[in-house]
Amino acid sequence: KYGWDESEVCSFTNQEYVINSTADGAQSFINYFIDTQKDFVLTCQLKQQSGTDKGLFGMFWSSGDSYYNQFLISSRGEYVVFSGDPAQIKTRKKAAVNPKGNVNKLRLEARSGTWSFFLNDELLETQKPLPVFGSALGFIALSEMRLTVSALSLLQDQEIRLSPDAVKNKKENLGSLINGPEDDLGPIISTDGKTLYLARQNSAGNVGGEKDDEDVWFSTWEGNQWSVAKNLGKTVNTPAADNLLAVSADNNTLVFEIDNQLAVRYRTETGWSSPEKLDLKFENESDHFVASLSADGKAIVFSAMLPGNVAYDPKRNENDLFVCLKQEDGKWSAPINLGSNINTVGEETSPFLAADGKTLYFASNGRPGYGDQDIFSTTRLDDSWMSWTAPVNLGPQINSVRFDAYYTVPASGEYAYFVSYDQGYGKADIFKIRLTKGNRPLAVTLVKGKVLNKKNNQPLAAAIHFENLRTKKDVGEARSDPKTGEFQIVLPFGVNYGVRATKSDFYSVHEYLELPAGDQYREVKKNLMMVPIEVGETIKLNNVFFEAGLAVLRAESSPELDRLVQILKENPTINIQLEGHTDNLGTPGVLLKLSEDRVATVKSYLVDHGIAATRIAGKGYGATRPVTQGNSEEERLLNRRVEFVITKK
């Protein structure tokens, strides 16, 4: 209760905390951060009521994973200050311990880098600061006895660094449609906010029943409420633990942890593919692995224990946050530690990189907070992934004295979802909280659409790429649903993009997408039509741009023309005819000459990049073949174009 981890042998009686320890010992603790590099005072008042006089009892702090920092006494007049595995305690020192049935006061004073241990206000010894093994703080009996505790206090000057826009709304439990009596963990909200994935532990509804450690479940938004959570099925879940780490922005790729490695499953027409392992070269030494896939698919932020940890110690399970970046050749980089501005001697876990690619949420017990793991946020400052703003605590409406983690936000930033043991229906439950503008990630655009065969309007499975036309760099990738052709991708404002889909035996019609600067989330519809590579097909080069009134290519035309070069190289038997068209502003002769010159410029580009001139014919039509009336600038823009016709395959 109140965040304490305790067993059935612990209870409150007559305003005292009672531990009826067995021969195996018993303990009760709360997870609470102590900055051991700063001054603090830890005090405990306890009394042995019964049991052997030689049994040790006392307090512990900064402990975890079977390693403790302990100040213990026995009723026969002994004390121990110990750091490590309690099973290794061998040496006891004499002290004036009050006999059984009387209160003893233990006090640790940490001042100016020296730790002083007092018993009943008498100094026993001083030491240098002991190591940090975790955040557990509590009291313990190592043998059979009845132990009562009347006080435990920690005094330390700690500042909880709060966001100036900390959430003030109340959190809401998602209720019994989502949460069961078991642990419900690891929520992942889809980018569009319409699907919620979660992990359910030891549920009768798991593929392996109640003995199944973890299955993936999901729920869909039905307009005014979430549907009843369902098991994702046997194509994904097994009788063993199935650990879903991330979902791609297009909702068509799932990232799993399998045998301590990352693997992906792709959506198929009938469900999900078999897992394919990603070539990430590291070996996580921790029992836990949590990750987040960036919206552009080019970064995986994860929590792991590696030799590169800020406070690496093979004796304890302490995770840091790392990132692996997808390189131009499709391979993944070695892990990059996110740095000491984020990682601490404590544990950092459950990272979630928001759709803006810059705002990172994570849980930590290594910095001042409200209790156990608290949720924090930080913002990436550059592309090194090691420069971040100082993390801020998300505040008491989200964080409690208990475990709070697994924060996840859709692209809209309207709601956040997270896990807490506080105020739950069962054990760990999933909550939501409405966000206001000041505590949302940066606003983005969600582009949604379908990939279709232009000839028959049928959906296609394809890879979709978005590129910044100014920098010529890919800025996002997605996959379309093989059954429906649907895709979605997140893009920042203030950039002009080229959008294309790739599929064998098809030529993508490349679309131009202009996203002016803005600070409000919005959704844009954009279907992508793919043209089958067949004789007689006419294909428009959408992203080929010329200087006004000239046959001079603008720099942002290169990506489109480079892809045509690639298609011609991959299909060496194809011949094409380039066709140039203008708007109707000018004399026919001048417009005809301009269209012919522009065709010649495009042909020269292709030849310069390795395509035989004999494979390329060309013809200019001036303004004689418009596709619109040309009565507005928007219509004239559509008439100004370069196309090519496949003349031989």
What are these regions (language model features)?
Residues 157-450, 454-455, 470, 477-479, ...:
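Short, conserved micro-motifs composed of acidic
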Residues 42-44, 102-111, 115-117:
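Short tryptophan-centered beta-strand motifs in secreted/extracellular beta-sheet-rich domains
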Residues 179, 533-574, 582-593:
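Short, solvent-exposed beta-strand/turn patches at coil↔beta or beta↔helix junctions
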